[in-house]
């Protein structure tokens, strides 16, 4: 992927060839809704996958403030990348351990999205007004 010029690669369940295995429909709907909310801010179809690879230069010096487990959202919004690719993968439910999904995580995710949308709007507003955008 890096050889093809991408600065960021995201493993995605929501591109052709990707998917989920052994998930209840309710979890599929929650995941789809979470990604639908994030897409206007990130442009990425599976912003919640948690599997990503990026060039170091994309995030060096970038101030991140992750709330909960979704640090990828911070990088997708604040990172300095020109091109990204989504690579298909099939997610299966864990065999050992406990899921990180709780209602507290849902609240943290929504708080983080609101914060990142504010960041995006602030950068857009600064560019629209003709000033140089603030550094992250």
At which residue positions do the language-model features occur?
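Acceptor/aglycone-binding surface of glycosyltransferases and processive sugar-polymer synthases
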Residues: 1-69, 94-104
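Hydrophobic helical membrane-anchoring modules
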Residues: 2, 38-43, 64-136
């Amino acid at each position: 992927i890096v050889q093809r010029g991408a600065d960021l690669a995201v493993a995605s369940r929501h591109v052709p060839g990707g998917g989920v295995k052994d998930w209840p429909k309710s979890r599929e709907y929650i995941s789809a809704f979470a990604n639908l909310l994030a897409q206007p801010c990130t442009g990425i179809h599976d912003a919640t996958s948690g599997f990503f690879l990026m060039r170091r230069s994309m995030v060096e010096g970038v101030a991140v403030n992750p709330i909960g487990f979704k640090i990828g959202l911070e990088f997708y919004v604040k990172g300095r990348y020109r091109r990204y690719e989504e690579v298909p993968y099939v997610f299966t439910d864990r065999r050992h351990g406990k899921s990180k999904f709780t209602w507290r995580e849902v609240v943290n995710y929504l708080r983080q999205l609101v914060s990142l949308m504010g960041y995006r709007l602030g950068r857009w507003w600064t560019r629209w007004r003709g000033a140089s955008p603030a550094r992250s």
